Amino acid sequence: MVTILSTPLSPRLTFLCETKLSLSRSNRSVCCSLSEEPKDQCLSRRSLVYVLVASPCLLLPALSSSAKTKSKSPYDERRLLEQNKRIQRENNAPDEFPNFVREGFEVKVLASDNYIKADSGLIYRDFNVGQGDFPKDGQQVTFHYIGYNESGRRIDSTYIQGSPARIRMGTNALVPGFEMGIRDMKPGGRRRIIIPPELGPPVGPSTFFSSKQFEVFDVELLSIQNCERRTIIGFYSDVTCS
């Protein structure tokens, strides 16, 4: 079992404080130091991938996310974990879905050792590797996906919509975490991608997303097509993929 703590704040700042008390109540001192960690290099129906799309989870040791977060007792953490598991069962979350223990800005993600955390902060697990080459910039990828929120509730699915999504790589058509997640997939591959807030979509009144959360996607890469730009009558051009 591996854990990671994440926060939407970047770069992360960690305060280390030590309070010293002498035998005399009047003599008290507090020593603090500030350290900075380096920065880490569903969906509205079909529109997620295209809002996923058109607008711009764990593994490894735990990382501190907030200086003001009170330390939780093991009992509090177990209680929050059981609460998250209960909600995921009610939402019919898929097997081995990661658990999220959230308190304020601090999020602890719990998952099996089958998950891998990339240097970028993206977390993924391959269920089937597939065969062939990885997609390149300019190529079109065709894929199915199911999107979930932290509580395991399904927020979108191309399977339900009845047709897969098609996106050209390297055109900023996907949020960073989603494109990173499929960039090293092969046709026929199936992968679960856990996108941390810093690699996810923007939030706010003008977007589909109201708060910074981890997003989870089960992705099946169907095919990769080459694309070329053609010019018609000297001034109009478009891109065709086959």
From Swiss-Prot:
One of its GO terms (cellular component) is chloroplast thylakoid lumen. Its main location: plastid. Residues 1-31, 32-67 form a transit peptide. Keywords: Chloroplast, Disulfide bond, Isomerase, Plastid, Rotamase, Thylakoid, Transit peptide. Its EC number is 5.2.1.8. Disulfide bonds join 227-241. GO terms for biological process: photosystem II assembly. The keyword Isomerase applies. It is found in: Plastid, Chloroplast thylakoid lumen. It catalyses: [protein]-peptidylproline (omega=180) = [protein]-peptidylproline (omega=0). Residues 138-225 form the PPIase FKBP-type domain. The keyword Transit peptide applies. GO terms for molecular function: oxidoreductase activity; peptidyl-prolyl cis-trans isomerase activity. Changing residue 227 to S: 50% reduction of activity. SUPFAM superfamilies: FKBP-like. It comes from the Eukaryota. Interacts in vitro with LTO1. PANTHER family: PEPTIDYL-PROLYL CIS-TRANS ISOMERASE FKBP20-2, CHLOROPLASTIC. PPIases accelerate the folding of proteins. It catalyzes the cis-trans isomerization of proline imidic peptide bonds in oligopeptides. Involved in the accumulation of the PSII complex. PPIase activity is unaffected on reduction. This is Peptidyl-prolyl cis-trans isomerase FKBP20-2, chloroplastic. It comes from Arabidopsis thaliana (Mouse-ear cress). The lineage of its organism: Eukaryota, Viridiplantae, Streptophyta, Embryophyta, Tracheophyta.
